[in-house]
Amino acid sequence: MTKTVALLDYGSGNLRSAQRALEHVGAEVIVTSDPDICTNADGLLVPGVGAFDACMKGLRGVFGHRIIGTRLAGGRPVMGICVGMQILFDEGIEHGIQTRGCGEWSGRVERLQARILPHMGWNTVEKQPGSEMFAGLSEDERYYFVHTYGVRDWTLVTDDLTTPPLVTWAVHENDRFVAAVENGALWATQFHPEKSGDAGAQLLRNWINHI
C-alpha cells in the first residue's frame, strides 16, 4: 500500500529534492501547507534551511507548530530534516537572538564550537543499537551535512513511564552534536537524507516503512 506524505510548505527548505527522494522510495508526496492534508496524511515531513528564527516565523504562519503537535498527540508520524529538526527543540539562539521552538524536546540549538564552519559535507554518525532509522545501514555510511548550529548538550531525563528518545550523535572536528533522533512517532535528522545518496534513500525508506 502506497503511503502518503505531506511535505510541509512553510517557506523554508528544498522541497523539490525532498519530494523526489520520497517518491524514489515509493511514497506519494503532497507539497502543501493545508492543515487538513498535513494532519491526515500517513506521514508529515518538515524540511528547513536557514535561520531558526525565520523558520519558526514561517512555521507559525501556516500553523505548522500546531499541526506537528496535533499529529504527535495522536501518535501520527512526523519527520524533521536539518532546521526542521532544530525547531522541534525548546529554543534556538542565533546571533544573540533567542527564539522559542516547538518544544517537543527539551534542549537548545546553538552555534557549533568547531574551528571550520559551516560543517559542510559528508560525515559518519554514531549509529545506536536497535535503531529503526538506520536499519540496514552500516556504521561507516556517510551522510550529507550543511549547518553551523546544532544541539551540542542534551541531557535526557528518564522515568518509569516514558521511553527516552534514541539519540544518534556525530562529531565535526572535536565538536559533538545530535545528528538524529528517534522518539516514537517523531523522527528527525540534522543531515539531509534527500542529499545523502543510497544511504539517505535507505533511511527514508525505513521511515516510510515505519509510518
Curated annotation (Swiss-Prot):
Family annotation (InterPro entries): Class_I_gatase-like (IPR029062), GATASE (IPR017926), Imidazole-glycPsynth_HisH (IPR010139)
Origin: domain of life: Bacteria
Annotated GO CC locations: cytoplasm
Keywords, ordered alphabetically: Amino-acid biosynthesis, Cytoplasm, Glutamine amidotransferase, Histidine biosynthesis, Hydrolase, Lyase
EC number: 4.3.2.10, 3.5.1.2
Location relative to the cell: Cytoplasm
Gene3D superfamilies, per the entry: 3.40.50.880
One of the record's GO molecular function terms: glutaminase activity
Pathway(s) per entry: Amino-acid biosynthesis; L-histidine biosynthesis; L-histidine from 5-phospho-alpha-D-ribose 1-diphosphate: step 5/9
Catalytic residue list: 82 (nucleophile), 192, 194
GO annotation, biological process: L-histidine biosynthetic process
Reactions the enzyme catalyzes: 5-[(5-phospho-1-deoxy-D-ribulos-1-ylimino)methylamino]-1-(5-phospho-beta-D-ribosyl)imidazole-4-carboxamide + L-glutamine = D-erythro-1-(imidazol-4-yl)glycerol 3-phosphate + 5-amino-1-(5-phospho-beta-D-ribosyl)imidazole-4-carboxamide + L-glutamate + H(+); L-glutamine + H2O = L-glutamate + NH4(+)
Domain Glutamine amidotransferase type-1, chain residue ranges per copy: 4-211
Cited function: IGPS catalyzes the conversion of PRFAR and glutamine to IGP, AICAR and glutamate. The HisH subunit catalyzes the hydrolysis of glutamine to glutamate and ammonia as part of the synthesis of IGP and AICAR. The resulting ammonia molecule is channeled to the active site of HisF.
Summary of subunit composition and partner proteins: Heterodimer of HisH and HisF.
Protein name per the record: Imidazole glycerol phosphate synthase subunit HisH
Annotated organism of origin: Corynebacterium efficiens (strain DSM 44549 / YS-314 / AJ 12310 / JCM 11189 / NBRC 100395)
Gene: hisH
